[in-house]
UniProtKB/Swiss-Prot annotation:
UniProt name for this protein: Uncharacterized protein YwbO
PANTHER family: GLUTATHIONE S-TRANSFERASE KAPPA, ISOMERASE
One Pfam family here: DSBA
Organism from which the protein derives: Bacillus subtilis (strain 168)
InterPro entries cross-referenced by the UniProt entry: DSBA-like_thioredoxin_dom (IPR001853), Thioredoxin-like_sf (IPR036249)
A GO molecular function held by the record: oxidoreductase activity
CDD domains: DsbA_FrnE
Superkingdom of the source species: Bacteria
Length: 200
């Protein structure tokens, strides 16, 4: 039986990127259906993070994020985009991509652009280039972002995450009835999937 999984994450969350890699290893070859769910850690107009000029954030990167990434075999770089962009436009692009069955590919590409290539994922032109790289029509994508076609869709997605699903931190993985908060190892995800399959 197919195990349904929801993954709540934000594109500027390093733990989301690290956890995504381990999660995707765990689900390879398994009968699962994954739904990627938007979550904005700092929606506009909240103050933006500026880790480049914040020694405490750099310390956390060196002592927590980098070691976890190395342990899980994930290539991740400290993003020098300053300050960190809001992710509402990137998520509006995700909703566009989903309509063309490219949500997963787009998701992966945006994470890579921010955490491996230092690209500003709050910039429409950059997001359009990333969309084209995964096979989406650039002109239609750019127009959708400029006219905020998916703004209400994204607002509803956030309302769901904050109020209905009561998500307070990301990443959060909901595997059937099992909730896994934070980045976890491949074995944790595999056990949760196996446990869910045994229930069916």
């Amino acid at each position: 039986m197919t195990v349904h999984i929801k993954v709540y994450s934000d594109y500027v969350c390093p733990f989301c990127f690290v956890g995504k890699a381990a999660f995707e290893e765990a689900i390879k070859g398994k009968d699962v259906e994954v739904e990627w769910m938007p979550f904005e850690l700092r929606p506009s107009p909240s103050p933006q993070l500026d880790p480049v000029n914040d020694p405490s954030k750099q310390y956390m990167w060196q002592t927590s994020i980098q070691p976890m990434a190395e342990k899980l075999g994930v290539e991740i770089n400290f993003p020098n985009v300053s300050p960190h962009p809001y992710t509402d436009l990137a998520f509006e692009g995700f909703h566009f991509a989903k309509e063309y069955n490219k949500g997963h590919e787009y998701n992966t590409r945006v994470f890579q652009a921010f955490f491996q290539e230092d690209q500003n994922i709050g910039d429409i032109d950059i997001l359009t280039k990333l969309a084209e790289e995964v096979g989406l029509d650039g002109a239609s994508f750019k127009s959708a972002l400029e006219t905020r076609t998916y703004q209400d869709v994204q607002r509803q997605a956030l309302k769901h995450a904050y109020e209905e699903a009561d998500i307070t931190a990301v990443p959060t993985f909901i595997i059937g009835d099992t909730v896994i908060p934070g980045a976890a190892g491949k074995d944790v995800f595999e056990k949760a999937i196996s446990d869910e399959q045994k229930k069916k």
